[in-house]
Amino acid sequence: MKAPRIMLAAGRSGSGKTMITCGLLRALQQMGKQPAAFKCGPDYIDPMFHEQVIGAPSCNLDPFFTEEETTQYLFCKHAAGHDISVLEGVMGYYDGLGGISTKGSAYDLAGMTKTPVLLVVDAKGMSVSALAFIKGYLQYKEDSRIAGVIFNRMSEMLYREIAPMAEKELGISCVGFVPELKECHLESRHLGLVMPDEVENLQEQVNLLAETLQKTLDFEKILAIAEGAEELSGKMPEVLRKVTESEAAAKVRAAKPILAVAKDEAFCFFYRDNLELLASLGAKIEYFSPLSDAEPPKNTDGFLFCGGYPELHAEELSENQTMRTKIRDNIRQGMPVLAECGGYMYLSESMEDMDGNVYPMVQAVPGNVYRTKKLGRFGYITLTPNTKDTFRNGGNPVRGHEFHYFDSTDCGSAWHAAKPLRKRN
């Protein structure tokens, strides 16, 4: 499959990747292109910004969770029908598992998807030193796939001097610069960036940045780099085909189960591919709001509670007693439920909010959720069930990602959690 594409990566978080990605997506749209957007890694919030810009869902690609064949399949599935795909990297380009490996990094994903990379260099306070920075990234891995450089927070006058030096001394294509735009800035909170709906004048900021990029970036070079990306097969991997064509899947499709998925301001962190897989297996997905609805959808066969910011809405969630009671009763009667992160917090006995107030929750699982003083657990983990009956998966390990400022007085004992590549559990 021919799929023009580029990845925007950087030397570290906070280099301007997200804002430049959004501006680039909008600029491509203004040029008449139909771009597709992707995010490297498990981040939920950056794809929401992409979606606000292009008006279509952005997708996560994570080389820790999926092998190369599956990763390519998911990319091709969502890139089909688009003129160009823009992948946003994560953290520093080479930063991967445990902070000691490139596995799971943006570099790893670029290799899996054979994607040419534009390195975003935050050049604030630098001139010639930026070349040493770039040289290090080019030479650290022979197959770096870095095909071009964007200098962020650099003046036009300095760029005109530095770009020719970089191209001559390093043999790298300089595709433009981004001047410092104080009007374009994304705030953050404890789980990362604020939500797109919370950013004042987001569309105006993105439009301003897009207009600027059309003047400061060489789109002819960028599009040529994207067009030069290698073709991918995009075929469905055998592991996925076996699941979707299995007898169990046929039974699920025949049963047409209703899956109630919590979705509102408190529960807003979803992976598009997970929901699409459930739908392809025959599940009828019905969204509901634990904040504002009186009760879950009727005739529900199962619950899905994803993450979000329930701690910002703890009082409202607690006050909706009818909803809490209905959910608790259904779960106690044996209804299947999958709850992660904020969704699990909601099902606990009580939850502490950001101001230290404690509110009763659904009380379907033991434990009281409390706020910690700092980020307690962060990064990828591998979960191994203590018995083969756990989760009915035959005792196979499950991969996950955690980013927690909250903890519970009862974390359970059904699984053993371990950090990959590190002696921590």
PLM region spans:
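ATP-dependent carboxylate-amine ligase catalytic core
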Residues: K2-M19, L25-T113, V121-G148, M157-E161
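Residues that mark the start of a beta-strand
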Residues: R5, K33-A36, K256-I258, K284, ...
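Beta-strand->loop->alpha-helix junctions that form or flank phosphate-binding loops
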Residues: K39, C174-K182, K284-S292
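C-terminal and late-domain segments of enzyme folds
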Residues: A110, K215-T216, V252-A255, F267-A279, ...
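A short helix->loop->beta-strand "cap" motif at the edges of active sites that frequently abuts
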Residues: T115, I172, R332-P336
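Internal gly/pro-rich beta-alpha loop/helix module
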Residues: V128-K251
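Phosphate-binding active sites in nucleotide-utilizing proteins
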Residues: E247, K251, A255-Q321, T325-N330
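Cysteine-nucleophile active-site neighborhood
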Residues: P310-D389
